[in-house]
Amino acid sequence: MGSSSKNIEQAQDSYLEWMSLQSQRIPELKQLLAQRRSHGDEDNDNKLRKLTGKIIGDFKNYAAKRADLAHRCSSNYYAPTWNSPLENALIWMGGCRPSSFFRLVYALCGSQTEIRVTQFLRNIDGYESSGGGGGASLSDLSAEQLAKINVLHVKIIDEEEKMTKKVSSLQEDAADIPIATVAYEMENVGEPNVVVDQALDKQEEAMARLLVEADNLRVDTLAKILGILSPVQGADFLLAGKKLHLSMHEWGTMRDRRRRDCMVDTEVIFDACTTVNSGPRPTETTNNERN
């Protein structure tokens, strides 16, 4: 029990370090993007490439830590206690779906294109927008870039489906021999059993391998997308991804806190109503008593 608790604590500490590092990278990305859009020189492009390389390195290091810890507590990554219920409802194989990276690219491309059109229409009336420039946002994706992204998107979805089938098979194994038969034959529900422990150990080992495979797919997908995008587009994409990840964690935590507060308030009201209803009732006065 002590070893298991320590493993979970290490996994949570690793996650908190990862979230902290993402927060630190946001101002770095913002600063370099602002410099690139103001000056537009090759030196700033090189700085952006260097920073995006560091961020990919961050992701690889975090995946390596998870791979090491997952062999000791893999099931904790599939429904992490350090996540909010909202995050766990959206989780896939211990993290985000790699295909969601493409949805983010498309969303940013659409929203930034809309902004550019609005600015263009304002410029017709003499409005001058600041910053920008060729290749300065995801709205500047070329036809060649979009084609490459679409091809990669289809390939990654296929990889996701293969992995989803694997985890589905593992989930079904819980209702198969020997776990199901041992549970049925037990006199007392849930009592320790060596055969079950061995079967569950094998299942956790398989889940750990799948987690590593999923993390590798996430890292590989991110690196390939950045390879298609320009330095500015890649940095913009990473900035949006980090802000989305951190925001979802905060939004999920706030929603969970509101639900808990609401439940507490409801219990207080219920207790108050119960107390009032169970109290002594006033006696009715008869006509004789009034006389």
Swiss-Prot record:
One of its GO terms (cellular component) is nucleus. Residues 8-258 form the DOG1 domain. A shift in isoelectric focusing of the protein occurs during after-ripening, probably leading to its loss of function. Induction: Up-regulation by glucose of the Cvi-1 allele, but not of the Columbia and Landsberg erecta alleles. May be up-regulated by the transcript elongation factor TFIIS. Up-regulated by cold. Up-regulated by histone monoubiquitination through HUB1. Down-regulated by the histone demethylases LDL1 and LDL2. The keyword NADP does not apply. GO terms for biological process: abscisic acid-activated signaling pathway; DNA-templated transcription; regulation of seed dormancy process; seed dormancy process; sugar mediated signaling pathway. GO terms for molecular function: identical protein binding; sequence-specific DNA binding. Disulfide bonds: none annotated. Changing residue 15 to A: Strongly reduced self-binding. Disruption phenotype: Loss of seed dormancy, but no effect on sugar sensitivity (in cv. Columbia). A T-DNA insertion mutant lacking the long version of the DOG1 transcript (isoform 1) but expressing isoform 2 exhibits stronger seed dormancy. Detected only in seeds. Expressed mainly in vascular tissues of the cotyledon, hypocotyl and radicle of the embryo. It comes from the Eukaryota. Keywords: Activator, Germination, Nucleus, Transcription, Transcription regulation. Homodimer. Self-binding does not influence protein accumulation but is required for full function. Single isoforms are functional, but the presence of additional isoforms is required to prevent protein degradation. Required for the induction of seed dormancy. The level of DOG1 protein in freshly harvested seeds determines the level of seed dormancy. Determines the temperature window for germination by regulating the expression of micropylar endosperm-weakening genes through temperature control of the gibberellins metabolism. Regulates seed dormancy and flowering time through an influence on levels of microRNAs miR156 and miR172. Regulator of seed maturation interfering with abscisic acid signaling components and activating ABI5. In cv. Cvi-1, enhances glucose induction of ABI4. The Columbia and Landsberg erecta alleles have weak dormancy phenotypes, whereas the Cvi-1 allele shows a strong dormancy phenotype. The Cvi-1 allele shows a sugar-supersensitive phenotype, whereas the Columbia and Landsberg erecta alleles don't have a significant effect on sugar sensitivity. This is Protein DELAY OF GERMINATION 1. The gene is DOG1.
